[in-house]
Amino acid sequence: MKDAILITGGTGKIGSRLVEHFHAAGRTVVFTSRSDANIEKTIAGREGLHGVKVDFRSGSAAETVVAGLDRLGLEVAALVNNARDLAALGVDEDGTVPDANWLAEYRIDVVLPYRLTLALAKKGTLRKVVNVSSMYGMNAFNPHLYEGPFRPPLQYACAKAALIHLTKCLAVQLAPQKIAVNCVTYGGVEGRVDEEFKKRYAALCPMERMMTDGETVGAVDFLLSDRAAYVTGQNIVVDGGWGIW
């Protein structure tokens, strides 16, 4: 198969939505997870859906993914760099980010997308790359959104900002190979927060609400389609207007 879509972090909140969307659209989808159980649960015996187990905290993670694709006999036409490591978000009680968490966040948000994109580009079938960033890669944390001591995970924001710039650099580097590289920057998605947080978020967002799970799909679908054939190096912001005021 030469038209598979690879979605890293395919069993998380956004990744699982993307996996289900593209599989329902008839695409061959391969996703990554650290858990065999999550892979089996997601596939659930369905054809055209494949999982590769990998721990992206490993220095050889990109090679592990490529080896997994080779075992499955799949060639990737589109890559969505979506993997996350929630453990890297930790901040000390005094608000200081430990060095280990700076490095872990940059590894999964910058180094991994870079290495995996280049590894797949060498295969010759890759045509589309979408990196997944965050509104905090473009905007500083707003202390009015949070209760209690304000200890923002700056490592996350800085790494996501770097990913946006990496998108532009790779778009230039890979253009001669006819590979388009773009980014989607999301605002806050419902599901991991309580009602009080949602109210505070709504008061700070022009559209007065958080994103729904289903709204995470549209921009990625566009960028991986023929409608975006002449689009590269761009960052599509899907944040309900969070960053415009």
Short names for language-model regions:
Residues F141, D221, T232-W245:
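Short C-terminal tail/terminal secondary-structure segment
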Residues A175, A180, V231-G233:
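Short, small/polar-rich loop/turn modules that mediate ligand/substrate recognition or access, typified
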Residues N82-G90, G241:
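Conserved NAD(P)H cofactor-binding loop of Rossmann-fold oxidoreductase domains
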Residues T11-G12:
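Conserved glycine-rich cofactor-binding loop
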Residues G90-Y106, P143-H144, P152, Y201:
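Substrate-binding pocket helix/loop in short-chain dehydrogenase/reductase
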Residues D85, V130-A162, T167-A175:
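Catalytic loop of short-chain dehydrogenase/reductase
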Residues G95-R115, V130, Y156-C158, L163:
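Catalytic Tyr-X3-Lys loop
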Residues A25-E40:
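Conserved glycine-rich Rossmann-like NAD(P)H-binding loop of the short-chain dehydrogenase/reductase
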